[in-house]
């Protein structure tokens, strides 16, 4: 482990393992609809960063464990801060799908 790894947070693969062992967890992909259609993690919910306000309509329980990712980690970091401002209490940034090593799906 490198010094800066401490500040980086969870790797997406580690984050997904943690999510799978968390009851009621939701995986949110904040990439654009086009990016999501090209390839996404099975079971993920696409809420693009610029539509994140709609999360309240789709996930009403603010204590739901949310695991957030994007392509490289920049948008997911922004999304985590925004979701916390909306009142969600259990939000984890798991970084970018470009480090993901599992199955992917195509299409919306």
PLM region spans:
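Short, surface-exposed ligand- or partner-binding patches at beta-edge/loop junctions that are enriched
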Residues: 69
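N-terminal glycine-rich beta->alpha transition that marks the start or flank
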Residues: 29
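Rhodanese-like catalytic fold shared by cysteine-dependent sulfurtransferases
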Residues: 1-25, 33-64, 74-108
């Amino acid at each position: 482990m490198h010094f800066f790894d401490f500040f980086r947070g969870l790797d997406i693969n580690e984050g997904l393992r943690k999510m799978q062992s968390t009851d009621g967890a939701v995986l949110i992909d904040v990439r654009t609809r086009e990016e999501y259609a090209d390839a996404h993690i099975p079971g993920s919910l696409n809420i693009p960063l610029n539509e994140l306000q709609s999360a309240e309509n789709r996930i009403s329980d603010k204590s739901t464990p949310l695991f957030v990712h994007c392509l490289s980690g920049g948008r997911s970091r922004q999304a985590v801060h925004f979701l916390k401002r909306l009142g969600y209490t259990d939000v984890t940034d798991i970084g970018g799908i470009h480090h993901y090593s599992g199955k992917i799906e195509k299409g919306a």
